[in-house]
């Protein structure tokens, strides 16, 4: 399992410092929360850790190796990122959309194999959507869409999963179910919330 270390990270947009000198460690099998009010830079920090945007100073280490030493494909195998406003492609079936999370790991000849289909179904089951695997994404509710993109992140199979506001659009029952699922996953989980 992957240990994440964020060391004195600073993120700037233009000349404005958004995140300044942030350090923390996220341990394998634990859920680490980045908490703060809207607009303080939580999403910017998470996107920088994931490599979606660059940090200006400091470092981010995965098991002691800087994330800048990994190629984008290597990072995609090591960490999954689910953004705050992500939504599934409306013209895809739910199972097809979740299968996109498997892209960094599978070879073209593996598409459709029983083991791949099982991973997709299991990821959907973790968020309570396996019964909707053949439903078009544009027929999902807001909460189902949110759980669907989280299932795609889980299907990626990375040891580290980063979730930006994962409980947005979820009712209390599904919020609790999701948090229990993440705690039980054994993955290193970093999530933002307010």
Task: Set out the residue ranges of the language-model regions.
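Conserved ABC transporter NBD signature motif
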Residues: 58-66
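Catalytic Walker B motif of ABC-type/P-loop ATPase nucleotide-binding domains
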Residues: 161-165, 170
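Helix-to-loop junction immediately C-terminal to a conserved catalytic motif
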Residues: 50
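Conserved ABC ATPase signature
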Residues: 110-111, 136-140, 144
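Conserved ABC ATPase "signature" region
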Residues: 99, 114-132
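The feature captures the beta-strand-to-loop junction immediately N-terminal to the Walker
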Residues: 35-37
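Conserved structural motif at the start of ABC-family nucleotide-binding domains
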Residues: 4-6, 18-21
